[in-house]
Structures are given as C-alpha cells and as structure tokens.
Regions:
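Sequence/structural signature of beta-propeller domains
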Residues: 1-241
Length: 241
C-alpha cells in the first residue's frame, strides 16, 4: 500500500496488474506484458550454454513493491506459461519505466549460482522482492528463488537501476523484510534438506554497512563470453599473471 492508500495486486496466472484505491475501487488495470529474452539457457541438458532465445515471454509477476506513490516494481517469476527471469518497474498507468531483461540472470550466472536444472522452466526464477530506503538511498532487493541469491539494486534513478551487490542466500529465498531503522534485511528461505542431513528451512539476516562488498569472491564477469559454473575442484593464481 502506498501513502495514498492505493494497493497494487498481481494476478499472476492472468499476467495482469490491478491498482485499487483505499475504498477498493479499481483505479487502473493492465497487462504485465511480455519480454523478448536472448542469450539464455532454455534446455535442461546438463550444459551451461547461453545461446537460446524466448520471444514474447509472459512476465507473470509474483511479488511486487511500491517504490513511490506512482511507481512499483515486480518480480517476473512465472507460474504457468511464463517467467521473464528478471524484474520490471511500472508506473501506475501501466507504462514500463525499466525492464531488466536478462541482466539479472547474467549476474546470477557469473556468480556461479545459475540452476541449470531449471533452464527449461524459469531459470533463476526471481520470486520475492522488498523495497526500503537505507541512509537516504532507495533499494530494491530481488530474490532469486532457484539461484539462492539476493540482488541489491540502487533505484535512485528509476529508469536506470544499478546492481550494487549480490548477497548469498539460504536455499530458495521466498520472502524478505527490511528493517532500515536497524540497518537490517531478513530473508526467509524455504528450501529444506533436513531429510538428507543438510540445512533446514531458515531465516538469514544481513546488516547494512558502508564498506566494499565481500561477495561474490569469484566471478566470471568480464570474460569474452558468458561463463556459468557451479563448483571448483582446483585453483591456482600468481601475482604476475
């Protein structure tokens, strides 16, 4: 709910968005639209190859957050026939102000968090989202359910959000709550590997700091081509390389 008492609702399976006033009257409703995806892995074949396309992919948004009284952001998870692997900022008249395209998923891939087994479905599957202002800077936090990662975006310029950091998450982050007064972000992670002796579903808490990001410690960003990875068996480096 924004400060005008307006609510925006995602009708996910219908790929639609509805804005209601405080009395429940429909102020606006419009399609969430589609995205053309290029340079993705759309095949579950055990190989990280990012040379496929999906045209007019339905956004089918899940979570959303107001950014101000006229703009809101949606996480384009997909549920039935869609999933656009990113996120979008709309104004409440239904105009797209920003579309991430494949840029968020590329960051997930470069950080070694891409879930190849979900390639033929919805890829990194951004589902949850939070918005908060920390020390005067507005941030959108985008949760990659399948990539187990949180993207932190500075949305000071709504037309050009900046990815400032990736936060390693527990398995399958589903929801998030920001507590700016304490400099905290909490995420609820629904993945539960208890039966296999692994981590149970849990909550993670992050603290806001004015310091360089410490994650990821290794990335394939800057390579001539997009390189995905998920494990390392050996590593060597030298100062003069």
């Amino acid at each position: 709910i924004n400060t005008l008492g307006e609510t925006v609702v995602t009708v996910q399976e219908n790929n639609h968005l509805v804005v209601l006033d405080y009395a429940g009257k429909v102020v606006a409703d419009f399609s969430a639209g589609t995205v053309d995806l290029d340079g993705i892995d759309a095949s579950d074949d055990g190989a990280l190859i990012f040379n496929e396309q999906q045209a007019e992919r339905l956004r089918e948004p899940d979570a959303l957050q107001w950014i101000d009284n006229d703009h809101f952001a949606i996480a384009n998870e997909g549920d039935m026939d869609g999933g656009a692997r990113g996120w979008t900022i709309f104004n409440k008249r239904g105009e797209v102000v920003y579309e991430s395209g494949t840029s968020f998923e590329r960051a997930v891939i470069e950080a070694g968090h891409y879930p190849d087994k979900r390639s033929d479905a919805k890829g990194s599957e951004p589902e949850g989202m939070e918005f908060a202002v920390f020390e005067g800077t507005p941030y959108v936090f985008l949760l990659s359910e399948r990539g187990s990662l949180v993207g932190v975006y500075d949305v000071s310029n709504l037309a050009e959000p900046q990815l400032t950091q990736l936060l390693p998450s527990g398995l399958s982050p589903e929801g998030a709550v920001a507590i700016p007064s304490r400099g905290l972000l909490a995420t609820a992670n629904e993945g539960d590997l208890g039966e296999d002796g692994g981590p149970r579903a849990h909550v993670m808490i992050y603290q806001y700091q004015d310091a360089p990001a410490v994650y990821p410690t290794l990335t394939s960003a800057g390579a001539d081509e997009l390189i995905g990875w998920g494990a390392l068996s050996g590593l060597v480096a030298a100062d003069d390389m």
